[in-house]
């Protein structure tokens, strides 16, 4: 008697459902980033409360249209305070947006319909209104640090309504 072949699971191929952040290969780790670039916005911390405030000011290396770093391989050398996410940091950083795939996976949640690993299309993150495309006013080199408070916005910490849908709108 031969064993029946294992029925493929709907989870097969969805590495983020079967692995912890620590188990991801470097390629899987990088592919988990949805390309929203919200983490590339300048943030301010209230010294008294520790609360983090987002601005619509991008890092000096952020290409706001592409929602990508202009020098990703050398970003830490060129921007010393650039945060290189690790599984530990994903679990500890309170400012990661609610849509962050690293945070979702760390919390045992699934990715949204617009994530490129689900949709197969890197543009759905923009279509869903999750990315910073069209919302970055300037870069940090154009705004004096003293004026960053004038550029505080709330949208990076929120999830747009159409991004919360269970599937891509028609």
UniProtKB/Swiss-Prot annotation:
InterPro entries assigned to the protein according to its UniProt record, in alphabetical order: Puta_zinc/iron-chelating_dom (IPR005358), UCP006173 (IPR008228)
Coiled-coil boundaries: none
A Pfam family annotated for this UniProt entry: CxxCxxCC
Domain of life per record: Bacteria
Stated family: Belongs to the UPF0260 family.
HAMAP family per UniProt: UPF0260
Name of this chain's protein: UPF0260 protein Rpal_2074
């Amino acid at each position: 008697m031969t064993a029946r072949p294992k029925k493929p699971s709907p989870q097969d191929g969805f590495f983020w459902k079967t692995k912890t952040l620590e188990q991801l290969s470097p390629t899987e780790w990088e592919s988990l980033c949805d390309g929203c670039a919200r983490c590339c916005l300048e943030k301010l911390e209230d010294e008294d409360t520790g609360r983090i405030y987002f601005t619509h000011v991008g890092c000096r290396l952020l290409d706001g249209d592409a929602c990508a770093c202009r020098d990703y391989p050398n970003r830490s050398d060129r921007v010393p305070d650039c945060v290189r996410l690790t599984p530990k940091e994903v679990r500890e950083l309170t400012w990661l947006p609610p849509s962050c795939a690293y945070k979702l996976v760390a919390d045992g949640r699934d990715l949204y319909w617009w994530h490129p690993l689900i949709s197969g299309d890197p543009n759905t993150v923009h279509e869903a209104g999750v990315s910073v495309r069209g919302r970055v006013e300037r870069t940090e080199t154009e705004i004096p640090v003293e004026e960053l408070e004038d550029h505080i916005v709330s949208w990076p910490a929120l999830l747009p309504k159409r991004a919360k849908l269970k599937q891509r709108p028609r």
